[in-house]
Amino acid sequence: MNLSIQDELQLFSEELYRHLTPSLLEELAKELGFVKRKRKFSGNELATICIWVSQRTASDSLVRLCSQLHAATGPLMSPEGLNKRFDKKAVEFLKYIFSALWKSKLCKTSAISSAALTYFQRIRILDATIFQVPKHLAHVYPGSGGCAQTAGIKIQLEYDLHSGQFLNFQVGPGKNNDKTFGTDCLDTLRPGDLCIRDLGYFSLEDLDQMDQRGVCYISRLKLNHTVYTKNPFPEYFRNGTIKKQSQYIQVDLENIMHTLKPGQTYEIKESYIGKNQRLFTRVIIYRLTEEQILERRKKQSYTESKKGITFSEKSKRLTGINIYVTNTPWEVVPMEQIHDFYSLRWQIEIIFKTWKSLFQIHHWQTIKQERLECHVYGKLIAIFICSSTMFKMRQLLLQKHKRELSEYKAIGMIQDHLSLLYQAIQRNTRIITKVLIRLFTLLKKNGRKSHRYEKKTIFDIMGVVYEYNGLRKQKKAA
């Protein structure tokens, strides 16, 4: 059924309202013990100050926060009184709202149509972002180490590129292990998924589990793993049987690197990785361009100086290549398209960039733990509202006008309308829909993705049919 834009946004408004209506927040605050009797600062006021009104709950002064709350809702509070209300129950309240939102149906109808969707029901992107917190919280949020990382919060996110649906989420200490979280995410896999993983989540066991569950993967290969390929000249016993230890030989990756031109791709046929535990898989080598090599060397120098991590000589020698492993069928994703498909994971970097540059989730002053956590979960709720709205707008703009939306531009514009959304949610879904229609009109006019650098966009790689500058574009996946 092809619904109108208004009907689509009305359904979205109803789902949003269902989780954030003032009466529901008041009831939830009582259930969770944040409010035990009628007070001037209740669940709706906490949500107002942490989600909607203040952009700097952790960095503005308490006097300023009291002023913002008074302007928005009327209650007059003292700085000391407000600070007391940032307690464990307040954190639990905001955490519950965020959990209910990201597990809701807000993004269930936001999936875009693409050639990639024919083969992969979900394209799962997993990554983490980390930021420092006050040093006195190091016992609660120990950092990841390195220079000035005594205390930090790490946020792990896995989401579906087609719909924007959050699949797995974790807020924890900066020292939390990426690989452990990646393994935990296996429980939510479904046949037909494609998982794109970077080096921090690399695990032979996890890749093997994906393969057994009918899930495809594309992953960078850690250089401490050896690649073996079928020996064209194996040794034989006198009876004509092949000597098992000569059936496969180790691949000289450095030698292959020197034979490739910048931007060239090479696939090692009939290969496996691992010594003790073998994983038979496709192995693809991509030769970086000179520009990409310079960028990588800069990152390596930064990592060595800031985080105290030393790269091995082998890693430095193989700086010029990316090695990918994948179990995707070659007829679905040929070797020439593997690097482009892997680059889809950089979309999550755009999401994380908005968290810091637009929402300033990493900004704080020296405050108590509960106020910092209220800030983090309040920001995450606002971020999810904006990102889920963006993914819905992206789907509608493609469906109705065949245009590609810029995720970064759109989230910024939606953030500018948070105060209007807040006022609408205090009333009804009809008013919310009006605000969303205004937003859609704005995004249609000013939110289109730029193609200035002639780089492939996410739509190009995924094989989405769309129009740009009046021309209809239909690119195969890559």
Curated annotation (Swiss-Prot):
What GO biological process terms are annotated to this protein in UniProt?
Answer: DNA transposition
A Pfam family for this UniProt protein?
DDE_Tnp_1
InterPro entries referenced in this protein's UniProt entry, alphabetically: RNaseH-like_sf, Transpos_IS4, Transposase_11
Q: Name one GO molecular function term.
A: transposase activity
Q: Which UniProt keywords apply?
A: DNA recombination, DNA-binding, Transposable element, Transposition
This protein's superkingdom? Bacteria
- Annotated TM spans: none
Q: Provide the function of this protein.
A: Involved in the transposition of the insertion sequence.
- What NCBIfam families does the annotation carry? transpos_IS4_1
Family, according to the entry, reads as follows: Belongs to the transposase 11 family.
What is the protein's name according to its record? Transposase for insertion sequence element IS231C
Q: Which organism is it from?
A: Bacillus thuringiensis subsp. berliner
